[in-house]
Each structure stands twice: as structure tokens, then as C-alpha cells.
């Protein structure tokens, strides 16, 4: 009788070990995925900052051209 109990216990311990092993593998995969996503976020953040700067520069250029155009139109009206 005690041998059967021992076998059941051994089986449950083995199942627990297998489950722990699978969970450890899953944790490693998730860590790798997390690292990859972190790198993607950093790259996207850098791209965002670059686009914000470019957008600001383009807005400034647009204002300069608008001012030039207004000045030119003003001169044309004078003539």
C-alpha cells in the first residue's frame, strides 16, 4: 500500500518538475520578447523625436515662405 502512495507521490513530483521546467522556458521566451519590444519602443521613440524636430523645421520654413509671399503680394499691389 505504501509503495502505491510513493509511486503517486513520485508521479506528482515529476509533474511538478515538468511544469516548473515548462514555466521556466516560457519565462525565458517572455524575457526575450520583452527585450525585443523594449528595443522597438526605444527605436520608435527616437523616430518620434526626429519626426517632431522635422515637423517643427518644416513649419518654420512654411512661415518664412508665407512671409515672403505676403511681402511679394504687397509689392505687387503697390505696383
Swiss-Prot record:
Disulfide bonds: none annotated. Residues 4-78 form a coiled coil. GO terms for cellular component: cytoplasm. One of its GO terms (biological process) is FtsZ-dependent cytokinesis. InterPro entries: Cell_div_ZapB (IPR009252). Keywords: Cell cycle, Cell division, Coiled coil, Cytoplasm, Septation. It is found in: Cytoplasm. The keyword Coiled coil applies. It comes from the Bacteria. Non-essential, abundant cell division factor that is required for proper Z-ring formation. It is recruited early to the divisome by direct interaction with FtsZ, stimulating Z-ring assembly and thereby promoting cell division earlier in the cell cycle. Its recruitment to the Z-ring requires functional FtsA or ZipA. Belongs to the ZapB family. Homodimer. The ends of the coiled-coil dimer bind to each other, forming polymers. Interacts with FtsZ. HAMAP family: ZapB. This is Cell division protein ZapB. It comes from Serratia proteamaculans (strain 568).
